[in-house]
């Protein structure tokens, strides 16, 4: 079996259907004895250029280990799903399991913000010192 990195972009109006799509696509891979090494839902992001007059899309990243036939089946599913705006499947040499730069940036941003969007202790303390 080979390793693949898969990114697909979903129409922003269909964002609520993304968890079901992820479940369906991961099911296709696991039923064919494939392995999912990394799965990241990046959420809605700004597009670099408009696609079908849309400026945002819902991004999903998967790193999987599967047979070529399974990947072909997945690409066919992408092609016939109108909600999938774009998809990219790249073969990789090794399984990638570490968090992507996008996920790391989100985690860092969330940790600075603190629970429920509160400012961190450092930010609040810096304001007190400045006063």
Swiss-Prot record:
InterPro entries documented for this protein: Ribosomal_bS6, Ribosomal_bS6_sf, Ribosomal_S6_plastid/chlpt, Transl_elong_EF1B/ribsomal_bS6
Gene Ontology MF, one: structural constituent of ribosome
Biased composition (Basic and acidic residues): 104-131
Keyword Magnesium found: no
Any single Gene Ontology cellular-component annotation: cytosolic small ribosomal subunit
GO annotation terms (biological process): translation
Residue ranges of the region described as Disordered: 97-131
Record-given protein name: Small ribosomal subunit protein bS6
Organism: Shewanella baltica (strain OS155 / ATCC BAA-1091)
Lineage of the species this protein comes from: Bacteria, Pseudomonadati, Pseudomonadota, Gammaproteobacteria, Alteromonadales
Gene (UniProt): rpsF
